[in-house]
Amino acid sequence: MATSQRKILVTSALPYANGPIHLGHMLEYIQTDIWSRYQKLRGHECHYICADDAHGTPIMLKAQQLGLAPEEMIAQVNKEHQQDFADFNIAFDNYHSTHSDENRVLASDIYLKLRTNGYIKSKSISQLFDPEKSMFLPDRFVKGTCPKCKSPDQYGDNCDACGATYSPTELINPKSAVSGATPVMKDTEHFFFDLPAFEGMLKEWTRSGALQTEMANKLDEWFEQGLQQWDITRDAPYFGFEIPDAPGKYFYVWLDAPIGYMGSFKNLCDKRPELSFDEFWAKDSKAEVYHFIGKDIVYFHSLFWPAMLHGSGYRQPNSVYAHGYVTVNGAKMSKSKGTFIKARTYLDHLDPEYLRYYYAAKLSSRIDDLDLNLEDFAQRVNSDLVGKLVNLASRTAGFITKRFDGKLAKIADTTLTEAFLAKQEQIAEFYETREYGKAMREIMALADIANGFVADAAPWQMVKQDDQQEAAHQVCSNALNLFRILVTYLKPVLPRLAQDVEAFFQQTLTWDGLAQDMAGHEISPFKAMMQRVELDKVNAMVADSKENLQVTADVPKTAKPEKTVESSNVSSEPLVDDPISETINFDDFAKIDLRIARIVKAEHVAEADKLLKLQLDIGGETRQVFAGIKSAYSPEDLEGKLTVMVANLAPRKMRFGMSEGMVLAAGPGGSDLWILEPHEGAQPGMRVK
């Protein structure tokens, strides 16, 4: 249990209910979920809340296009969103919708309090009106030429080319994005929130530590420009909540959207009577509230939202944490390149734990954009999770099960355990401050130490000697205890792996239990916990993303797909590229002695571009082999693996040393090489027949 239990409410921005979740969205939900899981792991009371943002003109128009009622469409999208999040192991405590009774009541309550307190003004404005559709046009439904830089085809609120903001009436040659008609000006009465009245309060709050420094600096620019009255009104037809005492007038979506955080929590409180809504949202609340958002919506969350809360008698959030955008392979996500990847498309091909880890490994507390480099993604997951983390257990657990009754030994030398536990507070601080990348580097550095310990001790050699049985038991038990500590550290990031490891150890992994004495503890037989990322699956995901676009655009599916992962040169017809060799007789083949070998150690060779130096255990002896697989594997990917070698190949003297055999690999070369990996039941020294 945590020393001092905190009460925490944490939210992610509400996804808009007019389309699917994609990998750009997933960055935020993974970031927030890791933080929420960490808080719970430390024993704090933490509630992770979200909802669909379900109002606005875009939803109304899309529902019309689909021939659905808006309520029907948002219900379908909500179901899809929740399934995608669940399959990515995003553990919301409540997921709701802004189109709810709770949100309607709270939005009206906040509006009426603001009106009573004198913060709502009414005035007549002239607005663009679509004469063909008989509707007023929101900013994003007017397009024209930017009045500042003269770039064409820009939205009615800001220019993507120069970043300028303006009103739709300032556009040059405006057109309705709904019908294409030239809009006309029409007068209408709108209600405005008096944002300038909160300038002093907002300047103090934005510099209180509630925002990252970069965001606080950006807000200073907006303060210098002067805060403006905020139009919170939209005219019918509109899908949203009608404003009290104003028939035909609706709340602008950005008024009720952040109130959706409160609405979702109220819904949770109604389901769990022990929870108090006021304990988290009252002005004198001692609980903590944190919002995780993208950098594109900072203005709403750091100016309008805290001002609305303050003006209506509610508390402000402790912090608003913004993150950057996701790029793929160094560029903006692209539908034509297949890098605009939907969450569901990813899930059809790859393990969600892979992306959770990769995002965590690259996330910091800053607002920098994050690049999902698909080649680096595969290499990092294979190296860190498969080659370092899971490999630590896979190469030692079998000995405990088969030779030591499945029970761990009392560890005599606890030096490594103490070193691992000494990193506990540092890793905790990294999680708390959202420096996940630093936490992952710290954890993987420990994994390197643990794997080096196992490689140096070589328990697979010890078990062959009668007088080394206890030493082997010690080494394997020590390694598994270190593995347990590592996975506990990673539990917020890899919840599914943590569950598998909990089943393996037959106990729950807890932060407070990190230092537990595991002597005599019985483990379950080890089962494979994570597979390598194969580039063909990554390529298939990218190809499917293109195919989805082609279907949407009604492009023939027979179009030849572009190459996906740039480093991949794998032919779909290997026999054409590399025909079968001439026939040999059996006697010639029988001369080749193929043996199972375990890669005990792998290291780079100085001044060699293609070679790795391998130390191979073939049962009764150790061989040194230089293998031309550097372009496909990192040394840490290989250590502990079983492979196949030619054991009776004449030694070859090389500039770097003597090579005493050859390991077998398949593939055309470059990064497209795969060493042969026998079934785990094979043992070093066994002959391949």
Swiss-Prot record:
UniProt motif 'KMSKS' region: location: 332-336
A Gene Ontology molecular function term of the record: tRNA binding
Chief location of this protein within or outside the cell: cytoplasm
Q: Does the keyword Metal-binding apply?
A: yes
Quick one: a GO cellular component term?
Answer: cytosol
Q: Please list the residues that bind ATP.
A: K335
All residue ranges annotated as the tRNA-binding domain in the record: 588-689
| Database matches in InterPro entries | aa-tRNA-synth_I_CS, Anticodon_Met, Met-tRNA-synth_bsu_C, Met-tRNA_ligase_1, Met-tRNA_synth, Methionyl/Leucyl_tRNA_Synth, MetRS_core, MetRS_Zn
Q: Which Gene3D superfamilies match?
A: HUPs (3.40.50.620), Isoleucyl-tRNA Synthetase, Domain 1 (1.10.730.10), Methionyl-tRNA synthetase, Zn-domain (2.20.28.20), Nucleic acid-binding proteins (2.40.50.140)
Q: What class of enzyme is it?
A: ligase
Residues engaged in binding Zn(2+): C146, C149, C159, C162
Reaction it catalyzes: tRNA(Met) + L-methionine + ATP = L-methionyl-tRNA(Met) + AMP + diphosphate
- Stored CDD domains: Anticodon_Ia_Met (cd07957), MetRS_core (cd00814), tRNA_bind_EcMetRS_like (cd02800)
Where does this polypeptide localize?
Cytoplasm
Task: Provide the E.C. number(s) assigned to this enzyme.
Answer: 6.1.1.10
What are the UniProt keywords, alphabetically?
Aminoacyl-tRNA synthetase, ATP-binding, Cytoplasm, Ligase, Metal-binding, Nucleotide-binding, Protein biosynthesis, RNA-binding, tRNA-binding, Zinc
For this chain the motif 'HIGH' region maps to: 15-25
Per its UniProt record, the required cofactor names are: Zn(2+)
Cofactor binding note of this UniProt entry: Binds 1 zinc ion per subunit.
BP-aspect Gene Ontology terms: methionyl-tRNA aminoacylation
Q: Which HAMAP family does the protein's record reference?
A: Met_tRNA_synth_type1 (MF_00098)
Oligomer status and interactors: Homodimer.
Regarding protein family, the annotation reads: Belongs to the class-I aminoacyl-tRNA synthetase family. MetG type 1 subfamily.
NCBIfam families given for it? metG (TIGR00398), metG_C_term (TIGR00399), PRK00133.1 (NF001100)
Role noted for this protein: Is required not only for elongation of protein synthesis but also for the initiation of all mRNA translation through initiator tRNA(fMet) aminoacylation.
Q: What is this protein called?
A: Methionine--tRNA ligase
